[in-house]
């Protein structure tokens, strides 16, 4: 049997289990299981079907074994900010409510009435977004204060899945930083902040960094699955894992392109300046205790919703092809909250264009071009802000993640920014997840070797600005 490491990579719309192993100095990948991840309505909240997700992970492990693999480790990454609370008997007190649920409406303002925005940013360095864990906990405190008091464990989504696999409870560093409750400098829970907000500080676990080995599978799972291996912490925030896979960090900006677009640079220190606050940048934790100085903005969620509104009549590739030959010019502000979870994305786009006295898209190609144009303009604005903060011109943009396969958007980014775009690594998150596991068990020495392996294992494609003659 082929020994492998398993990356469980769960995004906001789908999850995969990917087997990875080194062969002749190259990283080989095989997807052994895939599943949809959709929100469900529980008790009038938009929630993740966390029990089903767990069962899908077990199915993925079985599938790997059925495909001739012998797993020696497993790591889980997911989206950020969402969590569950457990009681003293380790039973769930809360459902896995999604960041897309409107329960956090008005919660930022409520928190700011207790603690200043400036203090929050100076201490945590985290971008202000209404769905951050801090505001979810504030909403929960308002609606069910007894649940927070009863809670003995706060576990983010990957932490909880790790607990189900191993029986051990830890909070992983990269995802913990997205709560806006971790001190950017000490890298520990900000207990003063937590207690000032009236949250139960005893429910937070020790924060463990990527590469930490949690432990083996629970005995009953070993018996059920017929295998045992170490569960290891990658960067459990999917973007943290994706950034590990960026081949060059010097003089380059990355765009992790998926449901969300995360645009930034990697640092060895946080930037908690007034300008960074004004531009709403974040300092999320990264692997190797690095900082991901980035802005989290709208991504391909809009086109996913457009596809759904057209009753899945078109594939994603169809929208890119239609937009390529389209001259439609209208732009929407993709970061307007109205586009987070509208009843109908197409109608919301049309309404925005009408309200701003722009041409209203009618055909599928016009809607698609409007979305892609708007994303490219949003990227350009974020990149300009990064360069202003750093007082450096970054010549290169790495586009990684699922969106890197969109050649039309890659070219649009090059044309809009005037920079060289290097795209590839559509499986960047799984790659980064696997790389960290391999470093944890000494299959790879360090990040420098890891990035050399990545360079030699995967194809990258370069896009330059097209200059119109005449």
Swiss-Prot record:
It comes from the Bacteria. InterPro entries: ATPase_NBD, Carb_kinase_FGGY, FGGY_C, FGGY_N, Rhamnulokinase. ATP binds at residues 12-16, 259, 304, 402. GO terms for biological process: glycerol metabolic process; rhamnose catabolic process. Substrate binds at residues 80, 237-239, 296. One of its GO terms (cellular component) is cytosol. It catalyses: L-rhamnulose + ATP = L-rhamnulose 1-phosphate + ADP + H(+). Its EC number is 2.7.1.5. Gene3D superfamilies: 3.30.420.40. Its cofactor is Mg(2+). Pathway: Carbohydrate degradation; L-rhamnose degradation; glycerone phosphate from L-rhamnose: step 2/3. Involved in the catabolism of L-rhamnose (6-deoxy-L-mannose). Catalyzes the transfer of the gamma-phosphate group from ATP to the 1-hydroxyl group of L-rhamnulose to yield L-rhamnulose 1-phosphate. This is Rhamnulokinase. It comes from Oceanobacillus iheyensis (strain DSM 14371 / CIP 107618 / JCM 11309 / KCTC 3954 / HTE831).
